[in-house]
A protein has these predicted regions:
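Catalytic binding pocket for nucleotide-activated donors in carbohydrate/polymer assembly enzymes
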Residues: 198-201, 221-223, 228, 357-434
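Conserved catalytic-core segment of nucleotide-activated headgroup transferases in glycan assembly
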Residues: 234-331
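Active-site-proximal region of nucleotide-activated glycan assembly enzymes
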Residues: 51-54, 130-134, 138, 154, ...
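Conserved N-terminal ligand/cofactor-binding loop architecture of enzyme catalytic domains
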Residues: 11, 28-144, 148-149, 478-508
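A short, glycine/small-residue-rich beta-strand->loop->alpha-helix junction that serves as a flexible
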Residues: 5-17, 160-163, 270-274
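Donor nucleotide-activated moiety binding/catalytic core segment of transferases
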Residues: 148, 306-358, 365
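C-terminal amphipathic helix plus adjacent low-complexity
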Residues: 242, 266-270, 397-508
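Short N-terminal targeting/anchoring amphipathic segment
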Residues: 2-4, 94, 98-99, 144-164, ...
Length: 508
């Protein structure tokens, strides 16, 4: 098969490295293209040099810029916002504010009345209307031409669920051309923390039964289209072993030899933009603890690669046996960076953090994983749905204060929490490797992708007469919306400057 894999940027290659390699090894031709250019470790270039079947282009793929583009963005942003008015998202304040930025304060103000209406009278009818308009709006001609030129047998996209993602239009155009298309769900939080699926792909590949239910419940996808394959991106950690001894590792990173250490895993900028104050409080209580093992415990702070700049000018030398490593953060994509990541988890006595996917990887290595509920992060801990998967699944042990956490850690160091290991294994089985802890997920995903070749081709039904009439009616509206976007943003900016920002300053 000739496969076109559309990714947001190069950073997304990491989670599909094994998948791309396996597809190439099985004789498929792949071309990886990107919505945006992001200078990074250039993993795709290395894959291209190793496999002649793997090609790529850094040239930005066509965006939707036709007369319908502004209206399309508006209705999709509106539908994305509506999901955050459901009861499941009542605590998701920060997630809701993120999508509100795409709609603008004027539109958000107009929608506030929906909060007080039963969903059958407000959110659901409006969602249905948006879905009708989505079907009425034609495909983008530039994207159609691009797909015709590439002429793939199959289109894969990831992550799709970003707000204002052009990948939706690629699905829409692929459907029009009769090209089968699949969504590869990139991460554990994608189906609940971002936008919704606006155009239904032929297949959606998810990690586990939890994500499958999310696709059905939150995105209205037919169950037979959602395929559970496991988390292929974590296969490499099951196959790996440590590259160095504990003593050598501790000496290399700059901790005190002969003492154990705790690993603090930093989170993304959205989840925890500033963690230094929190880490400082943790250190203070560790160093002042009555228990000698806690006082002596080292702390390795591992910066998140997308939020490492917060540590650039931080000096922890005043705290003994504490390091920030690796400085500047590190994405585990090269052999060296993978070893660094693995070893930092492997040699630690336990892992703690706010809310990050590295907690799952720590569970794969059998490490106890902790999170301290803190008011600074309440909107990105309890205020997200995906955080609760780790708690309910048995991976994450919560505490409501640093003091409570230290007591948990004491029990761990004294060997009184032996039941943790079985809970962690059960979580990894259910969430990461649902076909068995010894069964790699990459071959399952690859075979599921290959099986799409046997799906029957379904022609897109032509618009009925009323649909054609509605399209004619909508076109001038689309043109007006496109022409008035600049004015709308200007007015919104003034309102923000004169009223919203001063009020926010007063409240803070």
């Amino acid at each position: 098969m000739k496969i076109l894999f559309i990714m947001r940027n190069q950073a997304y290659v990491r989670n599909y490295e094994s998948t791309i390699k396996d597809l190439a090894n099985r004789g498929h031709d792949l071309k990886v293209v990107f919505n945006d250019y992001k200078d990074n470790d250039r993993l795709i270039e290395r894959l291209n040099s190793e496999y002649q079947q793997i090609n790529y282009s850094y040239e930005k793929i066509p965006d939707r810029c036709d007369e319908w583009s502004t209206l399309v963005k508006l209705i999709r942003a509106l539908k994305d916002y509506l999901r955050y008015l459901y009861p499941e998202y009542i605590k998701a304040k920060k997630l809701r504010k993120r999508i509100e930025k795409h709609l603008g304060i004027i539109m958000v103000a107009c929608l506030q009345g929906l909060r007080w209406l039963p969903k059958q009278l407000g959110v659901e009818p409006l969602t249905g209307l948006i879905e009708i308009i989505e079907k009425i709006i034609p495909e983008d001609k530039a994207i159609i031409r691009f797909l015709e030129q590439e002429n793939p047998d199959l289109v894969l996209v990831t992550p799709l669920l970003d707000f204002d993602s052009v990948q939706t239009d690629y699905l829409k155009c692929a459907n029009k051309l009769g090209i089968k298309c699949g969504l590869c769900v990139h991460s554990w939080d994608n189906l609940t923390s971002k936008g919704v699926i606006h155009v239904e792909p032929d297949r959606i590949f998810v990690w586990n039964k939890i994500q499958k239910q999310e696709a059905i419940d939150f995105h209205r996808i037919s169950a037979d289209k959602v395929i559970v394959t496991g988390a292929q991106c974590y296969d490499k950690w099951f196959e790996r072993n440590t590259s160095t001894s504990l003593e050598s590792f501790i000496e290399r990173v700059g901790l005190e030899v002969g003492k154990n250490y705790l690993l603090y895993l930093c989170s993304s900028g959205f989840i925890a933009p500033q963690e230094f104050g929190f880490v400082q409080e943790l250190l203070q209580q560790m160093r002042n603890a009555e228990h000698p093992q806690i006082r002596a415990l080292g702390l390795l702070v591992r910066p998140h690669p997308q939020n490492a700049q917060q540590w650039d000018n931080i000096d922890l030398s005043a705290w003994n046996n504490t390091v920030i490593w690796p400085p500047g953060g590190q994405n585990p994509v090269t052999e060296e960076s993978k070893a660094n990541f693995y070893d930092s988890i492997y040699h630690s006595v336990a892992v703690v953090g706010v809310n990050t996917s590295a907690m799952i990887e720590s569970g794969i290595l059998g490490k106890p994983v902790y999170s301290i509920l803190d008011p600074r992060f309440k909107d990105t801990q309890a205020g997200t749905l995906h955080f609760h998967h780790l708690v309910r699944g048995g991976l994450l042990q919560l505490s409501h204060s640093i003091e409570e956490y230290i007591q948990q850690l004491i029990l761990r160091l004294e060997g009184k929490r032996d039941q943790e290991g079985e809970q962690i294994r059960q979580f990894i089985y259910e969430f990461v490797r649902p076909y068995g802890l010894d069964t790699p997920c990459t071959p399952i995903l690859v075979k599921s992708i290959e099986a799409m070749a046997d799906l029957p081709s379904v022609a897109v039904a032509p618009l009925p007469f009323w649909g054609v009439c509605l399209r004619v009616f909508l076109l001038p509206i689309a043109l007006i919306v496109k022409e008035s976007e600049y004015l709308y943003r200007k007015v919104e900016g003034k309102i923000n400057q004169l009223f919203v920002e001063p009020l926010s300053r007063k409240l803070s």
